[in-house]
Amino acid sequence: MSTADAPKKPRETDDVPVPATLRKSLKNRHIQLIALGGAIGTGLFYGSSESIALAGPSILLAYLVGGFAIFMIVRALSEMSVEDPKAGAFSYYATRYWSKRAGFISGWNYWFNYILVSMVELSVVGKFVNYWFPAIPTWVSAAVFLVIICAANLLGVSKFGEFEFWFAIIKIVAVIAMIVGGLAVIIFALPTASGIKASFANWFALEGGFFPNGLMEQTKDGTWTGLLMALVVVMFSFGGTELIGITAGETEDPRRTIPRATNDIIWRILVFYIGALGVIMAVIPWNTIGGDDVPSPFVQIFDSVGIHAAAGILNFVCLTAVMSVYNSGLYANSRMLYSLAKQGNAPAYLGKLNAKGVPVAGVLTSAVITAIAVVVVFVWPEFAFNYLMSIATIAGIINWTMIMFTEMKFRKVVAAGGAPEDSELAGKSGKEALDAIHFKLPFAKVTPWVVLAFLALVVVLMCFSASYRVAVIAGVIWLAILFAAYQITQAKR
């Protein structure tokens, strides 16, 4: 048979009936925007009001410190993803380089974390819808958007990538437009609703200056405020950046794409968090940010200068941001369940794919459980955001802790000559193997311990807040459940 007559290898797209496997259909532009979309959502557009109230202008330092920590966490994960790109990312890596127990705990905790994050997103959807239509119950909005995003995730990974790409584009354009608009208000001294001239000097002009609540201080009603307490809210905002690792198994060229997306994180933090909030606090006095009538400081900045149409547009952007994070969350959860099933740590049906390479059972299972948020929003609307966010934060910290420990285990295995057979590190050991790692974690002997110490500090700080204290207790109970569940599943085998 001639070369011309030889059957061509099917191309991995969602429209070609190739054998059921995860498709490597995500391109560089998808990965770049997915990484951005997963981290810019409720924490920035909605939760930033709370963090500003806690720390005032010094919140900018909190985002800088927290951003550095999360950047190093993603660098650690990306080090492994580049060498061994697999679906399930750190659950697979924890199993491969640490232990089966670690993989079980890491995978199920990540799934639990993103279930909670998804619930948080759904719990605030109604607030943005109510900006235009105050009569619509918040639980109705949550239910409608849950169905829409679930349907999008069933279309195939390339379709998911396109959805997320455009969601993220909307957010990027909007935040940049907000920054430019805010700078115009400052430069041209446009009048504001507060009557205070817009200026970066406002960071220092109000009572208390740049650190109005200090590093940490207790108010008369017993609550704690200050820069350190704001770190807790800040870390929730950064949840989702590790999604880069989850996408590695469905990325066309992970060795080129993953490092580029990872290194761009630091610029996203500087522009989209520090830059945006810095401009907002220059235009709006920080102690007037927030309130039930205006659900986000990003909306409030345009309301403050009388541009109500732009405020409505920003409210739409906030809504798409929430949908984007839930879209990413449902994607990540379905892939994690798929990976857990392939490892034997979840029911086998969750490891099955349809003809388009979509883990349908994982998508539907995660969506149904996330639907609990609709009930929570209906029954306890005020409870929903704060408590769900606090529990999601502790679950996220557990994830990040597992990633850092797994990275150290990964290096030990690689140094001992245990690199994957299909890796360029195969056959190498010791310093030669470690030097051959393509995308190294900077200062790898020290960085994991510095990050772990920082995460431990955040957990200690959580104990000073009533709602977060509940989350810490819930986190301990959740870990105990995971340990017990692993032992039970092993005993049955």
Predicted regions and their residues:
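Helix-loop-helix connectors at the membrane interface of multi-pass transporters/channels
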Residues: 91-96, 101, 121-142, 174-177, ...
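Helix-loop-helix junctions that connect adjacent transmembrane segments
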Residues: 17-22, 59, 137, 169-312
